[in-house]
Amino acid sequence: MTGSNQPSDCYLAALRLLTGRDYTCAALRRKLQQKRFAAEEAQQAVERLIREGYLQDQRYAERLVAAVRQNGSFTGYRLQQELRRRGVPPELIDQVLRESPADGDELERARHLVERRYAGFDPQAADERQLRRVAGFLQRRGYRSDLIRQLFEK
């Protein structure tokens, strides 16, 4: 802080950033440093925001997991990678994924995703190239190989 009761410019910049969207602690610290604030000043602002309840990695991770699972865009390993990329600590990733209820059946979500992307896809009638294309699409979204095989067998 610059004065006894005056919030620092860094803290105010962090608050402005948080009005636009959620950040993890690491991402906000990085963003503040990109705006040319010193690392120590950015750290102090982040710590203050945590104390005041404006910044919580767990809340960020829970919201992201819920949103991703709701739209079914990706799952599994891809979801872990996305959380890691956004700066969520690894121990928190495991905890949030364990505690977060998976909406519905993963096989059904994969089936729905394939139907949306490849309308009329029939694994029994598809040639090898089509099967590889759909399998790659699902794998890039974090679906396991055994689940993809199961989807193709039905």
Swiss-Prot record:
Primary location: cytoplasm
Record's GO cellular component terms: cytoplasm
Subcellular location: Cytoplasm
GO BP term, pick one: regulation of DNA repair
Keywords: Cytoplasm
InterPro entries the record matches: RecX_HTH_1st, RecX_HTH_2nd, RecX_HTH_3rd, Regulatory_RecX, WH-like_DNA-bd_sf
Its job: Modulates RecA activity.
Protein name, per record: Regulatory protein RecX
Organism this protein belongs to: Trichlorobacter lovleyi (strain ATCC BAA-1151 / DSM 17278 / SZ)
